[in-house]
Design a protein with these regions (language model features):
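PRPP-associated nucleotide enzymes
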Residues: 1-122, 130-215
């Protein structure tokens, strides 16, 4: 597993899908300031890494969720990955909107889903876990069984881990924040001394003392 995590991290770094700004952090929609931004949409433009990622998602889904019947992508970043993996595995797929449409059938779930079907959610990354749990809840309210999530990257934040555990949702990510930081330092994408600041952020995102190397 460690080999896979490092291999995926190397792939993401090689296509510059991971950005590091410990001195001028990114601001998330939640208001959290982060030294790292992972744009997994760039995977779609890199065939070799895309094949690696989608094949790995297939492997973990087969291993962790052998009874899966449907794949559901999160809107919008998880849709393409769910479509590719669904094709590779011969499984139906759909996706869940952040809110229902205000026209047509006003669907929030796109694709055919029957009550009782076992669904795995495909997500590109997990931070605090809020958005992916919204998707899980929509699917469960529609009668689906959702044993878990397959994701490309996780920040490994305690808040996200606690939320998923409380909802009885398993997550299996291909790689994680600590591995990305370690590989990035070893391959000179970031200074080794910045790794501690990145981990400080991950451990307590509300504490901004890591910004600019402040203590």
């Amino acid at each position: 597993m460690e080999h896979l995590e490092r291999s995926i991290a190397e792939g993401l770094l090689s296509i510059r899908a991971v950005f590091f700004r410990p001195n001028e952090p990114f601001t998330w929609a939640s208001g959290i300031k982060s030294p790292v931004y992972c744009d997994n949409r760039l995977i779609l433009t890199a065939p070799e890494v895309r094949t690696q990622v989608e094949s790995a998602l297939c492997e973990i889904i087969r291993a962790d969720y052998p009874d899966v019947e449907v794949l559901m992508g999160t809107s919008t970043a998880g849709i393409a990955h769910a479509a590719i993996v669904g094709h590779m595995m011969g499984l139906p797929m759909g996706y869940v909107r952040s809110s229902g449409k205000d026209h047509g059938r006003q669907n929030q779930i796109e694709g055919r889903l029957e009550p009782g079907q076992k669904v795995v959610v495909i997500e590109d990354l997990i931070s605090t876990g809020g958005s992916v749990l919204d998707v899980v809840n929509v699917l469960r309210e529609a009668g689906a069984e959702v044993p878990g999530i397959a994701s490309i990257f996780t920040y490994g934040m305690q808040k996200g881990l606690d939320r998923l555990a409380a909802a009885n949702v398993k997550n299996h990510s291909l790689t994680n924040f600590d591995v990305i930081a370690d590989v990035a330092a070893k391959q000179n994408y970031i200074h080794p001394e910045d790794v501690a600041r990145l981990i400080q952020f991950r451990n307590n995102p509300s504490d901004e003392s890591w910004i600019g190397g402040k203590n």
